[in-house]
Amino acid sequence: MILFPAIDLKDGQCVRLKLGDMEQATVYNPDPGAQAKAFEDQGFEWLHVVDLNGAFAGESVNGAAVDAILKATKNPVQLGGGIRSLAHIETWLQHGLSRVILGTVAVRDPALVIEACKLFPGKIAVGIDAKGGKVAVEGWAEASELGVVELAKKFEGAGVAAIIYTDIDRDGILTGINWESTLELADAVSIPVIASGGLASIEDIRRMLEPDARKLEGAISGRALYDGRIDPAEALALIQAAKG
């Protein structure tokens, strides 16, 4: 079980949004590299980064900030937001990313994801962002008619490293993870699932470590870490203890 601290990038700064709304952004750190190093120093082993401007623009926008993060931390980093082509993927992996997250392109062009998995084994994750059980695309600005499990099943056996499942209705508002839909997805596919959206307290960490949730690869935490609602040392100690 991995707890992924999140850095969301908007205009070169580390922010959190409420419900995926770019107008509701709180700046938590103007220096993303320093934030990445702080998470590493706290004992986290991975880092989850999203280029928010990129997700809306359909191309990487916060490249300089991502490079600063990669220079600042030794931890593996996964990045999503605006990565829509094989050339994009290759460029970012050459920059030192450990994993690239494909979201909109997974809906628009599933064949590209499958091809990427062949070219870059173990390096491709799929981001599934859902609102009301349906997949959202283009930085959450647009809804599709595609169901979450329906999309996930398209990549069964393709070699996807993980599915990052975000419940947009809970993102950034600290109401707790949508366990029902998250575990339903984890039960439906053999691809490892990472929960995102709504992690609110140490109770969510405890819930994550219960037997039925052990099938999850981990969870992503943003606002709860920044606001001090989850103490990194306590959370990481719980996870470590559960590993036995």
Swiss-Prot record:
One of its GO terms (biological process) is L-tryptophan biosynthetic process. It catalyses: 1-(5-phospho-beta-D-ribosyl)-5-[(5-phospho-beta-D-ribosylamino)methylideneamino]imidazole-4-carboxamide = 5-[(5-phospho-1-deoxy-D-ribulos-1-ylimino)methylamino]-1-(5-phospho-beta-D-ribosyl)imidazole-4-carboxamide. Its EC number is 5.3.1.16. GO terms for cellular component: cytoplasm. The active site is at D8, D129. Keywords: Amino-acid biosynthesis, Cytoplasm, Histidine biosynthesis, Isomerase. NCBIfam families: 1-(5-phosphoribosyl)-5-[(5-phosphoribosylamino)methylideneamino]imidazole-4-carboxamide isomerase. This is 1-(5-phosphoribosyl)-5-[(5-phosphoribosylamino)methylideneamino] imidazole-4-carboxamide isomerase. It comes from Allorhizobium ampelinum (strain ATCC BAA-846 / DSM 112012 / S4).
